[in-house]
Amino acid sequence: DLVVFGGAPVFNYKYQNFYERTAVTIEIAQKYNKPVIFSAIGIESYDEKSKKCQRLKSALNSECVKQITTRDGLERLEKYNENNSFKIGLVSDPAVFSATVFDNYIGQEVITKKFGIIPVKKKVIKKGKKKKIGIFVIRANGFVDNHVDFTREQAAELWLNVIETVKNRNYDYELITSGHFGDEAFLDYLIRNYNVPVEKCVFNINMPETLFSKMAKYDGVISCRLHPSIISFSMNIPAV
């Protein structure tokens, strides 16, 4: 048996409690002598003075933890590794390979029937048709939680300005999320309070197949979140 943590911010402790769930899982694995590996983990930070951080560090240096790789924080990860108790490495995020993975599934009859997904086809831009930009909004407090002094109202103005910029450059657009309920709540807030056209908004992105098939139709992506940008890279779609 093997316990695998894959490609997620499970070390986060500043304003999320992932670290505690991770530590408890490691303790259970240690109790039952099950090896643990972490793959492509996001490393938020390291703080000697934080009890939460040191709680996580103590758990990570358990004998059952064999290997940890990170997608973005090798130097921070090294600080968690006391006496080289586990192997470490820098790797790409798994989403880099999303185009390869979903090219094998999107369009297959079983996927289409089960989820009602339109098979991804090569984009053909008809003469006179505008190129479309996917604009991925982030939850209202996403900036504040990450120590950026940016209110909900300022965030709304940001996205309204992005929309106007895209329109002024003669692009079509859609407002979309990668599935986080907080992002969808903020999208609803924009519709109700800032007259954002509901027909320009995409909800219920609850499966990776749905997200991939939707993004395959975009000619560009604007996103504050990590994974829409990484998926865009995988699909060779320009993104900012």
Language model segments and positions:
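Active-site anion-handling motifs in enzyme catalytic cores
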Residues: 1-240
